[in-house]
């Protein structure tokens, strides 16, 4: 599919247009019809009425290294086929953001616990990616400003991770928020699991400026 990706990037970068490849792994949010036992940091599954999500299998050290290799390999393919840059998806409850959430990641090894440990997989990916694609190929990360869930990834932790990513060589950080359990950002009433959701400020809702406070910080 190398030639197909080249044709795609050629079409997408005409007239000085940029075309970035977003790279992601669904983790525990993989539909059960696709994988009834998906990989995740811990065996904490989603409970969404009417949806089929399997109980996750906690990742081994070998799994972690394999996922890192796959993210880096895909980034190299993006560069070699002419994409402008890559974005690693670490928001909305996908695998990388699952590592950041203390509500989902209850590991007691070097990949869990402190925010430094929970962000480790990100930093390893960025480090390896830089070695493979060089300094002149842009790298972005899509990062939750918060999960908007009790006990989840907080704005204060997100700011710390953003600083880590910048220091690691990330060029652009796109801010987002929420997970499958809290898919909308306008308040508890929009949540699938309201008991675990945090209320958004009314002033923020009125402006539809969901990440304004985070950006100001």
Name these PLM-found stretches:
Residues 1-217:
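Flavin-dependent oxidoreductase catalytic cores
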């Amino acid at each position: 599919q190398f030639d197909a990706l080249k044709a795609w990037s050629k079409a997408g970068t005409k007239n000085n247009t940029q075309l970035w490849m977003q790279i992601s792994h669904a983790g525990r949010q993989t539909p059960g019809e696709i994988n009834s036992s998906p990989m995740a940091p811990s065996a904490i599954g989603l409970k969404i009425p009417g949806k089929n999500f399997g109980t996750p299998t906690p990742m081994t050290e070998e799994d972690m290294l394999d996922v890192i290799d796959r993210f880096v390999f895909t980034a190299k393919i993006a560069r070699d086929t002419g994409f402008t840059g890559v974005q690693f998806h670490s928001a909305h409850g996908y695998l990388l953001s699952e590592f950041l959430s203390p509500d989902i990641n209850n590991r007691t090894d070097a990949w869990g616990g402190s925010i430094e440990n929970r962000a480790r997989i990100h930093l390893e990916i960025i480090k390896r990616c830089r070695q493979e694609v060089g300094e002149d190929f842009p790298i972005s990360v899509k990062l939750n400003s918060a999960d908007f869930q009790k006990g989840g990834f907080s704005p204060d932790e997100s700011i710390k991770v953003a600083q880590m990513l910048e220091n690691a060589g990330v060029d652009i950080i796109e801010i987002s928020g929420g997970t499958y359990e809290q898919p909308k950002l306008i308040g508890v009433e929009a949540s699938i699991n309201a008991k675990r959701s945090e209320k958004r400020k009314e002033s923020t809702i009125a402006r539809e400026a969901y990440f304004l406070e985070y950006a100001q910080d």
